Swiss-Prot record:
A motif (DEAD box) lies at residues 343-346. It holds the Pfam family DEAD. One of its GO terms (molecular function) is ATP hydrolysis activity. It is an enzyme of class 3 (hydrolase). It comes from Mus musculus (Mouse). The gene is Ddx51. Residues 24-48, 94-105 have a biased composition (Basic and acidic residues). The modification N-acetylalanine is found at A2. The keyword Cell membrane does not apply. This is ATP-dependent RNA helicase DDX51. The modification Phosphoserine is found at S79, S432. It is found in: Nucleus, Nucleolus. The Q motif is unique to and characteristic of the DEAD box family of RNA helicases and controls ATP binding and hydrolysis.
Length: 639
């Protein structure tokens, strides 16, 4: 069998000079002489130095062994030795190579050690430089938060103060408001404007200072976006300027269109418009689908011998019903539309798949051609601002967006086609990197009413209904609002609370028709209903006076949902409390979510078992009755 000669790697210097046996032996003898000299010198030292040196030599030898191990490489030569002495020569060769490798490690350091007898052997042997960068030898730095790159109008909004109890503006301080409207405000018990109203009303009145037919200087006014907490008076902020701008109209046309996501919210806004147009010739129409299409058509247009006559100046509508009238109502025209108001704008943007906004804009800029009626007053789609485009003034279409959770996503806002928009916000604008560290830690993504207190209650799934009943009974609230994530949960909780007794309870969901929901809300406002169990249908913009307590029976899945739910209380400067029932698996995610929302303080509210014990007997009886009721309802559905 042929045997292969394996050469050992003896370091870069040996590799460069050639691994010959003579050279390796010479280096080994030199190294041996140096080591013998060093040993004799150590014997002459004092005992304590000898002890120290011996320990250091052992550590150096151990370190040398650890270094040598990874440096060994196996290299197969191409020649074979046929004689029987090859294995023995191979071993001798390997030993010599190892000794040579030791001599090549650091000859300068060893010679320095021989010249300095008092040197520490640990310092003589230096570690080879690391082949790569060593990670971990750096201090941890706080990573600066990356600021989003936003358009200028989003990054630098017009800041509005938050407090609706301290930062009030007397109505006399805004003389631009018409005296008749000021008188109407006082008649409704309003003597001061909230911060949002004091900022937005003058801006809107300025855009209509020369009438609603043309903008300031003949140019199109900027669109306005308002982001403010729930209960801060956003509705009145657009009702007052719109009514004042249309006070002196001569011919009745649809000049203002308010689009809202729900029927209940549309009813509420229509009610506010009716209050402030009661003493004016302006007419308000509600288009939500609560009445038949024919009935709504009668309130919008009237057929005459010459064609159709418009009967409404202000239309409050939901998106679906509005599109129905655009398609199916003869004489329904938006060509004279001056104000397009989108309330709860974030939700309306999410419903853009219905394509209601492009339909409205197309109807507003519809042209009958040069031979049509009022051809001189017909307007065209907005284009680039040039000298030619300003020669013929036309009535602008101004868009007004209002929401408590207005998105800052430029991609979503781009769908609205805003013209030189201006943002009013209670949140801080985008800060420079230098100012970011100085921003208050509580200034988060959204703002909340000042008088609102936030709590979370850890609990088990089986005890959630019992905790709801305990909170309502112990706090003695005249009006409490409880939110669930589904219609089924709302219905079962309603049946359980009804079987438990002691609480006047009602259910508010899509299970009931518009007429029934309106009746339930009215009874709740009058105090006839103590606990209203609802889905998120009432979480958007519904202003129910006197709600003292909001309970999240099911934890909200999204941040915006939480903002709108808890915003049903602590409205218009009043105080309120919000409790969220959390399972153990929900706590971490929920707490992280609300911390990003800018909640000032979330209180941990633990309910001891002994406080729930007196209610357990009635609760178990109600559970058994609930089971029977659910079975009966299932039989009725199956029948």
């Amino acid at each position: 069998m042929a045997l292969f000669h394996i050469a050992r790697y003896a370091g870069p210097e040996a590799a460069g000079q050639g691994d010959t046996d003579a050279e390796a032996g010479s280096r080994a003898r030199v190294l041996l002489e140096r080591l013998q000299n060093r040993a004799r010198e150590r014997q002459q030292r004092e005992p304590e130095l000898e002890t120290t040196g011996t320990a250091g030599e052992g550590e150096a030898a151990a370190a040398g062994k650890r270094r040598r191990r990874p440096r060994r490489r196996r290299r197969v030569s191409g020649s074979a030795t046929p004689n029987s002495e090859a294995p023995r020569a191979k071993r001798r060769k390997a030993d010599k190579d190892v000794d040579a490798g030791r001599g090549e490690e650091a000859p300068e350091e060893l010679s320095a050690g021989a010249e300095d007898p008092g040197a520490n052997p640990q310092e003589d042997v230096q570690r080879p430089p690391a082949p790569g960068r060593v990670l971990g030898d750096f201090a941890r730095r706080k990573t600066p938060k990356v600021q989003p790159f936003l358009p200028a109008w989003l990054a630098k909004p017009s800041c509005v103060k938050k407090s609706v109890t301290e930062d009030l503006t007397p109505i006399e301080d805004i003389p631009e408001v018409h005296p008749d409207l000021q008188k109407q405000l006082r008649a409704n018990g309003i003597t001061s404007y909230f911060p949002v109203q004091a900022a937005v009303i003058p801006a809107l009145l300025e855009s209509a200072d020369h009438g609603f037919l043309i903008g300031r200087g003949g140019y199109q006014p900027s669109d306005l976006c308002v982001s403010a907490p729930t209960g801060s008076g956003k509705t009145l902020a657009f009702v007052i300027p719109v009514v004042q701008a249309l006070l002196h109209r001569v011919v009745c046309h649809i000049r203002a269109l308010v689009v809202l996501p729900t029927k209940e919210l549309a009813q509420q806004v229509s009610k506010v418009f009716n209050i402030y147009t009661d003493t004016t010739p302006l007419r308000v129409a509600l288009v939500t689908g609560q009445k038949s299409l024919a009935k709504e058509q009668e309130s919008l247009v009237q057929k005459t011998a010459d064609g159709f006559r418009c009967l409404a100046d202000i239309v409050v509508a939901t998106p679906g019903r509005l599109v129905d009238h655009i398609d199916q109502t003869p004489g329904f025209s938006l060509q004279q539309l001056r104000f397009l108001i989108i309330d709860e704008a974030d939700r309306m943007i999410d419903s853009m798949h219905q394509s209601w906004l492009p339909r409205v804009v197309a109807a507003a800029f519809y042209s009958e051609g040069p031979t049509g009626s009022c051809a001189l007053l017909q307007r065209t789609q907005p284009q680039a601002l040039t000298a030619a485009s300003t020669c013929v003034p036309q009535m602008p279409l101004q868009k007004l967006l209002f929401s408590a959770t207005l998105t800052q996503d430029p991609e979503k806002l781009q769908r609205l086609g805003l013209y030189q928009p201006r943002l009013f916000s209670t949140r801080l604008g985008q800060q420079s990197p230098k100012d970011t560290a100085e921003v208050d830690e509580n200034s988060g993504k959204y703002t909340f009413p000042v008088g609102l207190t936030h709590h979370y209650v850890p609990c088990r799934l089986s005890s959630k209904p019992l905790i709801v009943l305990h909170l309502v009974l112990r706090m003695s609230c005249s009006r409490a609002l409880c939110f669930t994530n589904s219609r089924e949960n709302s219905h079962r909780l309603y049946l359980l609370a009804q079987a438990f007794g002691g609480v006047s309870v009602a259910e508010f969901s899509s299970r009931y028709g518009p007429g029934q929901r309106k009746k339930i809300l009215k009874q709740f406002e009058q105090g006839k209903i103590q606990l209203l169990i609802s889905t998120d249908a009432t979480a958007r913009g519904i202003d129910v006076q006197g709600v003292e307590l909001v309970i999240n029976y099911d934890a909200p899945q999204y941040l915006r949902t939480y903002v709108h739910r808890v915003g049903r209380t602590a409205r218009a400067g009043k105080t309120g409390q919000a409790f969220t029932l959390l399972l153990k698996v929900q706590e971490r995610k929920f707490l992280q979510m609300v911390s990003e929302a800018g909640v000032p303080e979330l209180t941990h509210h633990e309910i001891p078992r002994k406080l729930l014990q007196p209610l357990v007997a009635r609760y178990e009886t109600a559970l058994s009755q609930l089971e029977k009721t659910v079975k009966e309802e299932q039989k009725l559905k199956a029948a």
